[in-house]
Design a protein with these regions (language model features):
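A compositional/biophysical signature of low hydrophobicity enriched in polar/charged and small residues
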Residues: 1-97
Length: 97
């Protein structure tokens, strides 16, 4: 598919009302570049796992789509250099670590 640029984008919102959060989440659900979206505790409100074909697509997404969304005040992007582990297996009770 050519979507080799994987990024994690941490997003901080200015407003945290139920309406602001719902609006952000609804928008993110509609964005094909976003594979995962997690609501967090801590310094940032959301963590997005995103994929792009190249740096130009990433820049367009950041500057023209994500950052201009209402209430978004900060986006911190980390580019994945290599994937160390990816699994869908869940630890079962009684399994040793």
């Amino acid at each position: 598919l050519g979507l080799d640029l994987v990024c994690f984008m941490q997003v901080r919102l200015q407003a945290h009302s139920e309406k602001a959060l719902a609006r952000f989440e609804e928008t993110v659900r509609s964005l094909p570049a976003v594979l995962e979206c997690h609501y967090l505790t801590g310094e940032f409100d959301y963590l997005l796992k995103t994929v792009f074909r190249n740096r130009q697509e990433l820049e367009h997404f950041d500057r023209r789509i994500l950052s201009p969304l209402p209430h978004v005040v900060q986006v911190l992007t980390s580019v994945v250099l290599s994937e160390i582990k990816s699994t869908t297996e869940l630890p079962l009770p009684g399994d040793s670590a």
